A protein has these predicted regions:
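Extracellular, repeat-based ectodomains that mediate carbohydrate processing or recognition
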Residues: 1-202
Length: 202
């Protein structure tokens, strides 16, 4: 899976290639993003409990496309589910609720209940956030949202970048990210500047 600048004639697009258990190609490479305006890039993929998979990526100008197909916002986060045969399950969907600022650098992980969770870097400033925060959205096994999107980082001073996410046993998951916060009262603060922080969710 990766981004290509040659597929749809508009800019970067996200493509995938399935492989069998022996590492042999299963079918041809295929385009994942439905919307092709401007750039779709920086994909992340996770296998699901039912044998399918989900892909997420950042898409430029798609959040607020007007009637003429012209975008007015910057990057947003999108996703597409597939079944075990590599057939799309439903339509491409937007992940981020808030469209101001930029939503970039998505990461996705599967959950042991059949669902999945997506994290991303966000500059909307929602919930009193800083220049860049980390936000998340959970999904059920049928691709339905579970609750609202939420901010991951507790401290909002300075910047929080480049999330990664992993599903854990018992319906838990952990999000990690690069963090510039040097608050004196913050446990584990890396006073040298950037540090790596994490948060477990249940």
């Amino acid at each position: 899976m990766g981004s290509s600048s040659y597929g749809d004639g508009e800019g970067y697009s996200v493509y995938g290639q399935r492989f069998d258990v022996d590492g042999e190609q299963a079918g041809d490479a295929f385009q994942i993003n439905t919307e092709t305006y401007n750039n779709q890039q920086d994909p992340s993929i996770a296998s699901l409990q039912d044998g399918g998979f989900v892909v997420t990526w950042e898409s430029r100008y798609q959040d607020d496309l007007d009637a003429n197909g012209n975008g007015n916002s910057n990057y947003g986060i999108y996703g597409q589910r597939y079944d075990a045969n590599g057939t799309p399950s439903g339509s491409e969907f937007r992940v981020n609720t808030y469209t101001s600022g930029e939503q970039t650098h998505p990461a996705v992980a599967s959950m042991d209940d059949g669902g999945f969770v997506i994290a991303w870097q966000d500059s909307s400033g929602h919930d009193g956030g800083s220049s860049y925060d980390i936000r998340c959205q959970r999904y059920g096994s049928n691709g339905e949202t579970r609750g609202d999107e939420f901010m991951v980082n507790s401290y909002v001073s300075n910047d929080h970048h480049d999330p990664d996410i992993t599903g854990l046993d018992g319906g838990k998951f952990i999000v990690t990210w690069g963090d510039e916060t040097t608050h004196a009262n913050r446990p584990g603060t890396d006073t040298s500047g950037w540090g790596v922080f994490g948060q477990v969710f249940t």
